Amino acid sequence: MKTTSEIRQSFLDFFHSKGHTVVPSSSLVPENDPTLLFTNAGMNQFKDVFLGLEKRPYTRATTAQRCVRAGGKHNDLENVGYTARHHTFFEMMGNFSFGDYFKHDAIQFGWEYLTSPQWLGLPKEKLYVTVYETDDEAYDIWNKIVGVPTDHIIRIGDNKGAPYASDNFWAMGDTGPCGPCTEIFYDHGETFWGGLPGSPEEDGDRYIEVWNIVFMQFNRLADGTMEKLPKPSVDTGMGLERMTAVMQHVNSNYETDIFQTLIKEVAGLLNVSDLDNKSLRVVADHIRACSYLIADGVVPSNEGRGYVLRRIIRRAVRHGNLLGAKEAFFYKLVPTLATVMGHAGEVLTQKQAHIQKTLKAEEEQFARTLERGLALLEDALTKVENNTLSGEVAFKLYDTYGFPLDLTADVCRERELTIDEAGFEAEMTAQRERAKASSNFGTDYNNVIKVEGQTDFIGYDNLEAQATIVGLFSNGKAVDTIQSGESAVIILDQTSFYAEMGGQVGDSGLISTEICNFAVNDTQKYGQVFGHIGQLTSGSLSIGDKVTATVHATRRIAITANHSATHLLHSALREVLGDHVAQKGSLVSENILRFDFSQPEAISKSQLEEIERIVNRKIRENIQVTIETMDIESAKKKGAMALFGEKYGDVVRVVGMTEFSIELCGGTHVQRTGDIGLFKLVSEGAVAAGIRRVEAVTAETAIEWLHNQQKVLQQSAEFLKADSNSLVEKIQQLQDKAKRTEKELQQLKDKLAAQAGSELVKQANKINGVNVVVQKLENVEVKSLRTMVDDLKNQLESAIVVFGTVADEKVNLIVGVTKDLSSKVNAGELVGAMAQQVGGKGGGRADMAMAGGSEPQNLDNALKFAEEWIQAKL
């Protein structure tokens, strides 16, 4: 039985053998295509090539493209887990011709890959094809050249109410490239309900589309006229999950190897015995979408792609809750996913820590409100009228508890209820209008904080302020007093604490009186007021109390150094890489600075070194940092750069470090660049298509980082008994030695396997005159089994060979049959029957097949069964 990874690789290998360039999957975040929320088809990355706007160094390409359909026009989210084939994430295998081959080769390639025993080997009688009603050329190729009988070819006309509106006619839009398509369907058999394509029962599970070839041969003009393209092209798609289900002889994608592995992992984590539970399917599907989206740079948020990701995570968490999850579990699935995805999981392995950290934080954040939200929903469901949940309740769940509408719809669906979506939209519109009409005073900040007036910030020049408490909030409510031990948000009339803005984190410190201490952990801005977030450690505080607000000085100084260094870094990046560099996001904390920016390609080591040299040179120059306030037009004339995502008023603050760096900025900065001390880049990489990220440390943190690096270098040199200057050379020598040893070990294993094979020839039994070898082998690697079987078949010339081994508590079975006997004894049938004896599944070709199982204690019985089975066949 072929695994998903093997099928993926075989597709790429086949088309590579046909002269196609293997192109890596593009990001799930489409590059330079604002019309798409996510990559949802293999052709997305080639859109400009098909339109003639871009040229590639090849005219034939093949890909294994990761895709997401959740949100926007292509939204499968609500069906995921409840059907056999809906997914949020899927892989689309594709082969493409850009003005190279056309219908004849495209059809022949597809048929060869699907039916040739060398590749997938599907039975031809199980396949049906559809063509566009007037595409006689495609029909004739299928019938006269490929040899598909006429009763297996179906013409599909305009079945969507307009000319050229058909399941078998594709168009990029109302105008532009378009053309007919031909599809291949697999017949799962009479045991499944459903009719042929084009019939009233076509949506059943019997006939499943597994291959689609689009022939881009026309350009549709605005008046509907079709003109032939000078260089027609081909776009082919094969859904990997669907094809895997076919190859593994199951009807549901969730029964295939990848999903079964994930489902069992979820069940094990949550102690679930019913593996058919639909919530297991939901979680198994959603971990794929979430992990790959995060790997491609999407982060959970309340808008755009980030909100779709958040919706998927929260749906998974809610289904985990249904399965009995009591703590964060979703993030624990990432390592298993990375492993089971094979080569396609390498990107997950590289970013595993980031993916798990993001998922865990989001899961824990939602868990805090999930229980309360579900309680509210359960109460509301007992009061529904006309089987419809009110839009008002659905909106409250969304607004207060973070329940996406489709999550609430999920719960209602389980009760056979619907949601008043129009009422939900009306509530959403009303909230937008309220926000738009409100003033800066008395505004509902984050649905909780309502304070008249504003907080005056005096912290640029003062780390301590005398202030009056004008607002107190605890447990999500406005209060008059807080007591020792309570967590709260304190609003002051003025403060020296900087609130998180422009990438700079909020200050921490102490708010105190003679008898009270409130430890501030963070500072956030709510409209025009600053919220000091923390815990009262002694005494009590009330609105109107006079307090002293003292910023944690050491932390502020470290943050300030990192912020000024970020400005120098931005200018250095533009100097080395070019003016295309634009800030796309940043983080300025006390420990590290992070800077995201537009950059289409990786940065070389020499470029990174030059960037670092420039920043440190500017630090050594000890430049005076100037702060000016001016109108926005004057700032623009001065050449000031604006921060990504920030909004500016008519009057702005301009931070300058001579002409080298001039930016609009409201953050805190050093007085002279020399105060930064030292700058050290510590990482660089991609976070999304066309977006790079660098991280750096400064001052004491940079010195500590260098000390740690030096310590690692010294320890490594001592461990390898080498001088630190020759450490690289020593490592290279060890690597070369390891490769030689590995090669010698493999040669020894092959030699031992050959010797074992020679011994087994002597032990061959005769059953009705046929050489039969049935053996349980010890200490033989799985990859050596096939070699041993082939060697025995060659030595015996006419034979049936059956081996069984146990490794890591798993059974491995292999059956080999020489071609003269394969008509009597089918290796695929035999290994499949044996696999059932050891709790597994398997199959393969008539002459060679492998299987696995999970019950090693039954291997001896399986081998005895094989002997009896062979004897019966012979």
From Swiss-Prot:
InterPro entries: aa-tRNA-synth_II/BPL/LPL, Ala-tRNA-lgiase_IIc, Ala-tRNA-ligase_IIc_anticod-bd, Ala-tRNA-synth_IIc_core, Ala-tRNA-synth_IIc_N, Ala-tRNA_ligase, Ala_tRNA_ligase_euk/bac, DHHA1_dom
Alphabetized Gene3D superfamilies for the sequence: 2.40.30.130, 3.10.310.40, 3.30.54.20, 6.10.250.550, Bira Bifunctional Protein, Domain 2, Threonyl-trna Synthetase, Chain A, domain 2
GO cellular component: cytosol
Major enzyme class: ligase
SUPFAM superfamilies: Class II aaRS and biotin synthetases, Putative anticodon-binding domain of alanyl-tRNA synthetase (AlaRS), ThrRS/AlaRS common domain, Translation proteins
Protein localization: Cytoplasm
Main location: cytoplasm
Record text on cofactor binding: Binds 1 zinc ion per subunit.
SMART domains from the UniProt entry: tRNA_SAD
Keyword Nucleotide-binding (UniProt): yes
Functional note: Catalyzes the attachment of alanine to tRNA(Ala) in a two-step reaction: alanine is first activated by ATP to form Ala-AMP and then transferred to the acceptor end of tRNA(Ala). Also edits incorrectly charged Ser-tRNA(Ala) and Gly-tRNA(Ala) via its editing domain.
Recorded domain comment: Consists of three domains; the N-terminal catalytic domain, the editing domain and the C-terminal C-Ala domain. The editing domain removes incorrectly charged amino acids, while the C-Ala domain, along with tRNA(Ala), serves as a bridge to cooperatively bring together the editing and aminoacylation centers thus stimulating deacylation of misacylated tRNAs.
NCBIfam families attached to this UniProt entry: alaS
UniProt-recorded name of the protein: Alanine--tRNA ligase
